[in-house]
A protein has these predicted regions:
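Short, small-residue-enriched loops and turns at beta-alpha junctions
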Residues: 2-4, 31-37, 84-86, 109-112
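Catalytic alpha/beta core domains of metabolic enzymes, predominantly
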Residues: 83-168
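Glycine-rich, proline-tolerant flexible connector loops at the mouths of alpha/beta enzymes
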Residues: 1-14
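Short, well-ordered coil/turn segments that N-cap beta-strands
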Residues: 19-25, 51-53, 72-76, 97-101, ...
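Distinct, well-ordered alpha-helical segments
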Residues: 36-45, 66-68, 87-96
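Surface-exposed amphipathic alpha-helices with a cationic face
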Residues: 12-22, 48, 67-73, 124-128
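Catalytic domains of carbohydrate-active enzymes, especially glycoside hydrolases
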Residues: 1, 45-55
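Catalytic beta/alpha-barrel core
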Residues: 29, 51-63, 76-86, 102-109
């Protein structure tokens, strides 16, 4: 919660520190935040101002606006769920440049709900064949670590990784 200006200031302070250490900022965005920050598919300047390098979209427009968003003038890479196959394929047919797209698997906070390594590899191979990068979530064994809500079973993409040390995942 907070005003548009408070949200921008909060995240801008964070992204400055991240960039100072040479890291890339990937910001997760749902439709509510997108509209609250008054962003549009033709104007992502608010995210550029915040310092976002990759914008992970938790929603799509399901029309030609996805291609416009992906080809944004701000140069922000657009990340979509690996499950958005039809959305991404349609966006590319509508002129989206594949080099402006990345994908990311979801995380699974509840034990026994995450996909297997084999299932993840199948979808990774699909995107790899299209030269579109894929990201996953790794799980933390640190007690008291958290996610977007209280969780106690980690936030892995792959079920087999849930209880593995980070250096093995």
């Amino acid at each position: 919660p907070g005003t548009k200006e408070e949200i921008i200031a909060y995240f801008k302070d964070f992204t400055k520190i991240v960039h100072k250490y040479g890291m890339i900022v990937s910001g997760d965005c749902n439709s509510e935040l997108f509209h609250r920050l008054e962003a549009t598919e033709t104007d992502l300047s608010v995210f550029k101002d915040i310092g976002v390098d990759i914008l992970r979209m938790d929603f799509s427009f399901n029309d030609e606006r996805d291609a416009t968003l992906i080809n944004n003038k701000e140069g922000i890479k657009i990340e979509m769920s690996t499950s958005f196959i039809d959305v991404i394929e349609t966006a590319i047919k509508n002129g989206a440049k594949p080099e402006n797209i990345s994908t990311c698997h979801n995380f699974y906070p509840e034990r026994y709900t995450a996909p297997s390594l084999e299932a993840i590899n199948d979808i990774n191979n699909y995107w790899k064949a299209k030269n579109i990068p894929v990201a996953i979530f790794i799980s933390s064994l640190v007690k008291g670590s958290h996610g977007p809500w209280p969780v106690s079973d980690g936030l892995p993409t792959i079920e087999e990784h849930r209880d593995m040390p980070i250096e093995i995942q």
